[in-house]
C-alpha cells in the first residue's frame, strides 16, 4: 500500500508543499509541482511550432530560396557576363521540356555569383551557408548546454532563441534578391536559433517526466526510507550528495520499477512530441505548396513561404511561453569560474570542461568510439544528401517549387512508415539492431550510386534512369524517408546499449554534438565540388563514399564487448565517486558537489 504524505505536508498549500518536500526535491529551489496537462501542452506546442522550420524550411524551401536569390543576381557560368533569368518558370520550358520520347532532362543554365571576388556557384552558396550555420550552431549548443540543465535560464533562453529564429524567417519577406548576403545571414541565425532552442526544449523532458503525478507518487512510496535521512539532516545542509545529482539516474534504492516507469513515460512523451511536430510539418508543407502555385512560383513566392513558416514558429511559441514553467535546475558551481556579473562565464566554461571529460571517458570505450565515428559520417551524409538532392532537382532537372515541395512530403510520409516497418523487418528476419543499421546504410547507398549512373554513356542515351527525369526524384525521396525512419529509430537506442549505466545524459550529449557538428563538413565539400565542376552531379561520388565509410565501422562494433566495457567503466567511476572524487555532471560531464544557497524562479 502506498504511504501517504505526512500530515505536515498535507496541511500546507499543495504547490508550496511540493516545492519544499525533501523527498521530491533533489536540490534547493527545485520546482517539484506536478506536471500539468497545460504544461505538457506548452511543451508539445513548441514542437508543433519549430519542427515546421526544420522540415519545411531547412529541408525544402530555404536552400531553394537562397539558390534562387543568388541566381537572380548571378551571371551564366558559360560566359561569366550574361545575367541569369530573374524568373523561374513553373511549367516545362525550352530548356526543361521532355518530349514524348525519353530524352534527357536539360535543366536551367548554371549560374555563378562573386562574393568578395570569389566565384561561387549559386547552388554552392546555399551549401556553404548551411555549413557555416552548423559550425556556429555547434559551438553555441556546447557553450549553452550547461544553461539547459542548470540555473534559472532554461525557459528564458528557449524563448529568446525561438524569437531570434522566427523573426529571421519573417524578415525574408522584405528582402529583395540583391540582398542575398543578408538572406544568408538570416538563414544562419534561424538555424542557430532552432538548434539551440531544441536543446533547451529537450532538457525539459526529464523534468516533466520526473514531476509527473504518477512518477511522483511512485517516487514517494519508493523513497519512504529517506524520510529518516531528511529528518536527521534538515534543509540547512550545505551540500547536495553526489548520488542525488540530476545527471545520474536515481538508482540508489534499486527501484527498477521507478526507472522503468520513467523510461516508459519519457518514450511516450518524446514519441508524441515527434509525431505532433511531423503532423504540423506535413500540414504546413502542403499549405506552402498550394501557396506557391497560387502565387505563380516566383522568388516572392519563396520569400512569402519563409515568412509563413516564421510566423507559424512565432505564434505557436506563445503557448509554450505561457504554459511552460521555468523549472530551475541545480546551480553551476560558479565559484570555480566566475561570480557576479561574470557568472555567465561559469556556464560556458563548465560546459566545455564537461564535454572534454566525457570525451576522455569515451576514449576508454572502443565500441563507443567506433559507433560515434560511424555516426559522425552517417549523420553528415543524412544532412548533406537532403540539401544536395533538392538543389540538384532544381538546378539540373529544372523542377518547379511545388514539385520540390512534394518530394519533401513524400520523404516525410515514407519516414513515418519506415519508423514502423523496420521494426517488423528486423523481427521477421531476426536481425540484431546493428545489422538493421547496416541494412539501412546499404539501402541509403542506393541514392548516390543511382545518381552516378547518369554519367554512363548508354544510360545517358536512354534519357531515363540515373536521375535524368524529375519523377525519379520522388522514388529516391521515398527511399530517403524509409532509411531516415530506420536510422532515427535504431541508432539512438543502439548507442544506449554501449554507454556506462547511469551516465546516459553525458554520453547522449556527446551523441547529439557528434550529430550536429558533423553536418558542417558535407555541405561545404559538396559546394566545393560543385564550384570545381560547374554542376552538382559529381558530388554524388563524394556522397557515395561518405555513406559507405560508416559500414565497416558499424560492422566492427561488438555489442557484448561494448556492454562489458561500459559496465566496468561505470563501476570504476562509481568507485572513484564513492571515495569523494569527481564523477559526472548533468547532461555534460563533471561530477561535483553543489553548494546550497540557490533560489530559482517560481511561478
From Swiss-Prot:
Coiled-coil zones: none
Compartment annotation: Vacuole membrane
Keywords: Amino-acid transport, Autophagy, Glycoprotein, Membrane, Transmembrane, Transmembrane helix, Transport, Vacuole
GO CC term (a single one): vacuolar membrane
Biological process, per Gene Ontology: amino acid transmembrane export from vacuole; autophagy
Residues passing through the membrane, by range: 46-66, 122-142, 157-177, 181-201, 274-294, 304-324, 342-362, 368-388, 401-421, 439-459, 464-484, 539-559
Pfam families for the chain: ATG22
Glycan-linked positions: 254, 582
Bilayer disposition of the protein: Multi-pass membrane protein
Main location (coarse class): membrane
InterPro entries in the record: Atg22 (IPR044738), Atg22-like (IPR024671), ATG22/LtaA_families (IPR050495), MFS_trans_sf (IPR036259)
CDD domains referenced in this protein's UniProt entry, alphabetically: MFS_Atg22_like
PANTHER family recorded: AUTOPHAGY-RELATED PROTEIN 22 (PTHR23519:SF1)
Similarity comment: Belongs to the ATG22 family.
Function of the molecule: Vacuolar effluxer which mediate the efflux of amino acids resulting from autophagic degradation. The release of autophagic amino acids allows the maintenance of protein synthesis and viability during nitrogen starvation.
Name of this protein: Autophagy-related protein 22
Species this chain originates from: Coccidioides immitis (strain RS) (Valley fever fungus)
Amino acid at each position: 500500500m502506498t504511504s501517504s504524505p505526512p500530515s505536515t505536508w498535507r496541511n500546507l498549500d499543495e504547490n508550496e508543499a511540493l516545492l519544499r518536500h525533501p523527498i521530491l526535491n533533489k536540490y534547493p529551489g527545485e520546482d517539484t509541482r506536478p506536471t500539468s496537462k497545460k504544461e505538457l501542452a506548452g511543451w508539445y506546442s513548441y514542437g508543433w511550432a519549430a519542427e515546421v522550420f526544420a522540415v519545411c524550411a531547412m529541408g525544402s524551401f530555404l536552400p531553394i530560396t537562397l539558390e534562387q536569390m543568388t541566381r537572380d543576381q548571378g551571371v551564366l557560368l558559360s560566359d561569366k557576363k550574361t545575367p541569369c533569368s530573374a524568373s523561374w518558370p513553373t511549367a516545362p520550358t525550352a530548356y526543361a521540356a521532355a518530349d514524348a520520347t525519353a530524352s534527357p532532362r536539360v535543366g536551367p543554365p548554371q549560374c555563378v555569383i562573386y562574393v568578395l571576388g570569389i566565384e561561387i556557384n549559386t547552388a554552392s552558396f546555399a551549401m556553404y551557408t548551411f555549413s557555416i550555420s552548423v559550425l556556429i550552431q555547434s559551438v553555441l549548443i556546447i557553450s549553452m548546454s550547461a544553461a539547459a540543465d542548470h540555473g534559472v535560464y532554461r525557459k528564458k533562453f528557449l524563448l529568446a532563441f525561438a524569437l531570434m529564429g522566427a523573426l529571421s524567417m519573417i524578415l525574408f519577406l522584405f528582402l529583395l534578391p540583391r540582398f542575398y548576403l543578408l538572406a544568408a545571414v538570416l538563414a544562419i541565425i534561424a538555424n542557430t536559433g532552432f538548434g539551440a532552442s531544441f536543446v533547451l526544449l529537450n532538457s525539459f523532458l526529464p523534468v516533466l517526466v520526473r514531476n509527473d503525478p504518477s512518477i511522483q507518487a511512485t517516487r514517494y512510496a519508493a523513497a519512504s526510507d529517506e524520510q529518516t535521512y531528511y529528518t536527521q539532516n534538515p534543509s540547512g545542509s550545505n551540500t547536495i550528495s553526489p548520488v542525488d545529482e540530476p545527471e545520474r539516474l536515481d538508482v540508489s534504492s534499486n527501484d527498477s520499477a521507478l526507472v522503468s516507469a520513467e523510461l516508459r513515460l519519457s518514450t511516450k512523451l518524446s514519441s508524441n512530441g515527434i509525431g505532433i511536430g511531423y503532423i504540423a510539418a506535413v500540414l504546413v508543407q502542403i499549405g506552402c505548396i498550394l501557396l506557391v502555385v497560387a502565387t505563380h512560383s516566383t522568388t516572392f513566392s519563396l520569400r512569402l513561404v519563409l515568412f509563413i513558416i516564421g510566423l507559424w514558429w512565432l505564434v505557436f511559441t506563445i503557448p509554450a511561453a505561457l504554459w511552460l514553467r521555468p523549472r530551475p535546475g541545480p546551480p553551476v558551481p560558479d565559484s570555480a569560474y566566475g561570480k557576479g556579473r561574470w557568472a555567465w562565464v561559469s556556464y560556458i566554461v563548465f560546459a566545455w570542461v564537461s564535454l572534454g571529460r566525457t570525451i576522455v571517458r569515451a576514449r576508454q570505450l572502443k565500441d563507443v568510439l567506433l559507433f560515434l565515428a560511424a555516426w559522425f559520417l552517417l549523420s553528415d551524409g543524412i544532412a548533406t544528401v537532403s540539401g544536395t538532392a533538392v538543389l540538384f532537382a532544381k538546378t539540373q532537372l529544372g523542377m518547379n517549387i511545388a514539385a520540390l515541395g512534394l518530394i519533401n512530403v513524400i520523404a516525410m510520409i515514407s519516414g513515418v512508415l519506415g519508423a514502423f516497418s523496420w521494426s517488423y523487418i528486423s523481427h521477421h528476419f531476426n536481425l540484431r539492431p546493428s545489422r538493421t543499421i547496416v541494412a539501412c546504410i546499404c539501402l541509403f547507398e542506393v541514392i548516390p550510386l543511382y545518381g552516378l549512373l547518369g554519367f554512363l554513356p548508354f544510360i545517358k542515351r536512354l534519357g531515363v534512369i540515373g536521375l535524368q527525369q524529375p519523377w525519379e526524384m520522388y522514388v529516391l525521396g521515398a527511399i530517403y524517408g524509409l532509411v531516415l525512419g530506420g536510422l532515427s529509430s535504431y541508432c539512438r537506442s543502439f548507442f544506449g546499449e554501449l554507454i556506462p549505466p547511469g551516465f546516459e545524459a553525458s554520453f547522449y550529449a556527446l551523441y547529439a554534438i557528434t550529430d550536429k557538428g558533423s553536418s558542417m563538413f558535407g555541405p561545404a565539400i559538396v559546394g566545393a565540388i560543385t564550384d570545381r565542376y560547374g554542376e552538382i552531379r559529381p558530388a554524388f561520388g563524394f556522397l557515395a563514399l561518405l555513406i559507405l565509410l560508416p559500414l565497416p565501422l558499424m560492422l566492427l562494433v561488438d555489442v557484448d564487448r561494448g556492454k562489458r566495457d561500459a559496465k566496468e567503466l561505470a563501476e570504476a567511476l562509481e568507485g572513484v565517486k564513492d571515495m569523494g572524487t569527481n564523477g559526472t555532471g548533468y547532461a555534460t560531464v563533471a561530477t561535483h558537489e553543489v553548494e546550497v544557497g540557490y533560489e530559482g524562479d517560481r511561478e
